[in-house]
Amino acid sequence: MRPENNLRLRLFQTMKFIALERLGLFVPIPGIDQKLFSSDYSNNAISNLLNVFDNNQAPKLSVFALGIIPYINATITIQILSSAFPALKKLQSEEGEIGKKKLNKITKYLSFCFAFIESLAIVLRLQKYAFDWNLYFIVQTTLILISGAMLVMWLADNISYKGIGTGASVIIFVNIASAFAKFLLNQLFVHSIKFLDFASYFALIVFSIACIVFVQEAIRKVPIISAKQLDSTSFYSNDYFLPLRINQGGVMPIILASSLLALVDYVIRYGLSTLQAVYFINDILPFKILFLLLYSAFIIFFNYLYCSLVLNCFELSNNLKKASVVIPSIRPGKMTEKFFKDTLDNLTLFGSGFLAFIVLAPNFLEFVFHIRVFKGLAVSSLLIVVGVAIDLIKQSKTYVIAKNYENMVH
């Protein structure tokens, strides 16, 4: 059996790299009063930036504090620039694997730049917690944070190539799952939550997961007819169709929007907090509502952008034409391309609406009625966990099928 198709080996590699990433979260940065930092964690300037995807993690400034955030920010920048610069768009859609490798290299260089900026922004806020504040401390801590971010990116790459799933998504998935497990144990054994409250909370999570799975797995069946079918008895069969996912973007729009929102929050709160305009805006529209609206706008924007990159209507139309496959009542070429574009727009609109609703609904209930629907767990985090879990299961099945096929051949 080929090593790349060995599911056990890939699972072992994935667990190995995840263990290294988790280990790095518990290695503290030297020269910092961790107790003071922990006690002031919820009020200090960098907590929101560090805990984008894992709100309940231990409030400790570790070597992996930045995590995968610089890489996500670099990905966001590349996605936005791709829509503005044809050269980048060409690398993504037309140049195949070579183009993807070039784009991946650019993303990594950009990740380093983001890691440097974010590390420096964090270090300059650590004067209160440093044992000895001087130039040596600033340089040393900045280099440690940058190195940690680059190492996490390397671990994510290794998970993608040697393990199962997309490395960045898997790391985010593990961090969120770990945070939720910690929260759940805390509620059960420390706060002694009532059984009825726990049962209601658990039932609500199960219902939410069911809704997420339903929408994530839902497809729009586009009927197709091949040239071979014209000469066979299966001409009128409904078994031949092209599946288009309703939520084509998956969890990526949520991941990108969450990361960008954390950056915006940091800039507004600690970069523009002295401006009178910020207080004026807050008087008109509370920041809580403003950020929820901004979050929804980011989700919709990234969903449309990501869907346009995942599914190229022109290429899909051309591939069907080359394979002598047509859609009933739709002419090949431009008409087929327009059909796919209109269909994808409708599906993306529904998918964006679903993503925005599932993020807004619990926050709206909490803000208006003061009911905490998902105590300790953001529904966007739940969406990421479920989405990544589905992808991991699908990829595992692919390796199992590949293994069975090899056994049949040999």
From Swiss-Prot:
TM stretches of this protein: 61-81, 106-126, 135-155, 170-190, 195-215, 248-268, 289-309, 349-369, 373-393
GO cellular component, one term: chloroplast thylakoid membrane
Location, primary (coarse class): plastid
Up-regulation conditions: A monocistronic transcript.
A Pfam family recorded for this sequence: SecY
Disulfide bonds: none
Location in or out of the cell: Plastid, Chloroplast thylakoid membrane
Electron transport as UniProt keyword: no
Keywords: Chloroplast, Membrane, Plastid, Protein transport, Thylakoid, Translocation, Transmembrane, Transmembrane helix, Transport
Segments forming a coiled coil: none
Quaternary structure and partners: Component of the plastid Sec protein translocase complex, which is composed of at least SecY and SecE.
Similarity field: Belongs to the SecY/SEC61-alpha family.
Name of the protein in its database record: Protein translocase subunit SecY
Organism name: Cyanidium caldarium
Gene designation: secY
